[in-house]
Regions:
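Short glycine/threonine-rich beta-strand-turn micro-motifs
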Residues: 21-46
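Short alpha-helix capping/helix-loop boundary micro-motifs
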Residues: 84-90, 150-157, 254-264
């Protein structure tokens, strides 16, 4: 790596250290070209190009390519958010019906978006409707209800929605979906978010996880009862309490308050998050169940999805998991920061 490339990488590490939370794609092709979502990174690149006697054409996202419509609202039951502009690209997370996404860039039928948890990924335009910022704010103000095992009957057919999907509840008891279609609830229910949050505060987090997602299959990048991964589960359960967590396990590990590690779980509270490594990197998270039983609630591929397991069990897999426990974090009643 030559000096110029090192300087570019230094700028990336300073201003966009986590590529999941921002954009920094810069190449040297006669000059500096590319795109970034960081104004500070763009300004640093301009200074670097000037000092090196190079031209600079690094776009600051979002820009004119996005145009007037800067918000995308998910109109499908859920939208896979992918790592690239290919249908077979890795699913890095999901956005649920009614969630609003900030549009950062466009590429043919693909939108680069920032999710409410700040995760940056690509979504196909077919999953969303787009509009200006005021349009997105209007929907957010009206969509104060959440689906709970709901199916909605519309003139066009029945629509099934995942837990947590956002809808607008109308005075006559019908609901408005994110695409403006109105329908009647025929299965499950749609509840005000405030009511659900108040109920969630009366449940232990592991119990809430089991009630809402117990038996859900494991799905990398999943966030719903139709398929969910380990950090998607912990993020969703804490969100039900109104506590925002980052999307991935290593990001969640940087949040919350540290709890001292214990050989037998002494000092852990129900709902504490336990973090595990694989090849030196945090890659798994589980909820401590509490009650002195030594159990965890998690979504794991070896057990097919969301379930309860004995962390101190004698099975070789649990022995390995215990050996890879690197930290415990507590979030309830704490300020959830990233410092």
């Amino acid at each position: 790596m030559d000096r110029l490339e090192r300087d570019i990488d230094d700028i990336r590490r300073k201003w966009v250290p986590d590529g999941r939370l921002g954009v920094f794609q810069v190449a040297v092709a006669g000059g500096l070209t590319g795109a970034t979502s960081s104004r500070e990174a763009q300004e640093s690149l301009r200074r670097l190009a000037k000092e090196a006697g190079l031209t600079e054409d690094v776009r600051l996202l979002p820009d004119h390519v996005v145009g007037h419509d800067q918000v995308a609202i998910v109109t499908a039951a859920l939208a896979p958010l992918l790592g690239d502009t290919r249908l077979d690209a890795a699913r890095v997370t999901e956005a649920l019906h009614g969630e609003a996404l900030e549009i950062l860039d466009r590429q043919n039928d693909w939108l680069r978006v920032r999710a409410p948890d700040e995760y940056v990924a690509w979504v196909h335009a077919g999953y969303v409707a787009t509009g200006p910022v005021d349009w997105g704010k209007d929907w957010a103000e009206r969509a104060t209800a959440r689906a709970v095992g709901a199916e909605v009957q519309t003139d066009g057919g029945r629509r099934r929605l995942p837990l947590g999907a956002r809808l607008a509840l109308r005075r006559d008891g019908t609901v408005e979906l994110a695409d403006g279609v109105v329908g009647a609830i025929v299965v499950g229910e749609v509840r005000r978010e405030g009511e659900l949050r108040a109920e969630a505060r009366h449940l232990a987090l592991p119990e809430l996880a089991q009630r809402s997602y117990g038996g859900a299959p494991y799905l990398w990048g999943g966030r719903t009862e139709w398929g969910i991964d380990c950090s998607g589960l912990t993020q969703a359960v804490y969100a039900a309490r109104g506590i925002p967590l980052r999307r991935d396990s290593d990001q969640q590990f940087s949040q919350g308050r540290e709890v001292a590690l214990s050989a037998d779980g002494a000092g852990y509270d129900a709902g504490d998050l336990l973090f595990f490594t694989e090849r030196g990197r945090v890659s798994h998270v589980a909820l401590w169940s509490g009650g002195g039983a030594g159990r965890i609630v998690h979504s794991a591929l070896p057990c097919g999805g969301v379930g309860i397991e004995d962390l101190f069990g004698s099975e070789p897999r649990m022995t390995r998991l215990r050996a890879n426990l690197v930290g415990v974090r507590r979030f309830v009643g704490e300020s959830v920061g990233t410092d």
